[in-house]
Regions:
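Beta-rich strand-turn-strand
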Residues: 54-90, 103-104
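A broad, low-specificity signal marking well-ordered, structured residues that form hydrophobic/aromatic
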Residues: 29, 49, 95, 141
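Acidic, gly/ser/pro-rich intrinsically disordered tails
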Residues: 1-2, 19-22, 42-44, 103-143
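Glycine-rich strand-loop-strand elements at beta-sheet edges
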Residues: 35-64
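Core FKBP-type peptidyl-prolyl cis-trans isomerase
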Residues: 4-46, 91
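Short terminal (N- or C-terminal) low-complexity/amphipathic segments
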Residues: 83, 88-107, 136, 142
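Short, well-ordered turn and helix-capping elements at secondary-structure junctions
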Residues: 13-15, 33-37, 55-57, 81-83, ...
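OB-fold and OB-like beta-barrel modules that bind single-stranded nucleic acids
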Residues: 5-13, 31, 67-79, 97-100
Length: 143
């Protein structure tokens, strides 16, 4: 049996840093991941995936990402059972991140931190860039 997850998406908010009871660093974040297919209205739906990363990598992740950062992660799905403050049994499903990669430049991340994203559109593409690839008829190709 395999429990492997690979996702690419953007952080929905700043990563949250915690310490466990065993004094281990823990970072929680939510990754917005677009689905491959479009809905009936022609829009791509987005899933919001809870993720957690532990240890030294957690601190590196928290210090090098910000809301909107484009990242890739690899890890596993984990189901945790706990009792909340009201004494109710709760379940939490999240991705435990083993590895991550930055999928945008440091300059892009820094410009997002400073709030100066005027040079690009909301998707990180230059203004006026086509949203979809251009369709080219095979008759127009020289080969």
């Amino acid at each position: 049996m395999l429990n492997n997850v690979s996702l690419t998406g953007r952080l929905t908010k700043e990563p949250e840093v915690f310490k466990t009871a065993a004094d281990l660093e823990l970072v929680r974040f939510t990754l917005a991941v677009d689905r491959v297919f479009k809905s009936k209205t022609g829009q791509r739906e987005t899933d919001f995936i809870e993720c957690v990363i532990f240890g030294k990598r957690a601190l590196i992740f928290a210090s090098s990402t910000t809301k909107g950062s484009l990242i890739g992660i690899a890890g596993r799905i984990s189901n945790n059972h706990f009792e909340n403050k009201q004494g109710e049994q709760q379940w939490r499903t999240s991705v435990v991140v083993d590895n991550f990669a930055w999928l945008e430049s440091r300059a892009m991340t820094e410009s997002r931190r400073s709030g100066s994203m005027q040079a690009t559109g909301t998707d990180g593409m230059p203004p006026g860039a086509p949203a979809e690839p251009a369709e080219i008829a095979t008759d127009d190709l020289p080969f």
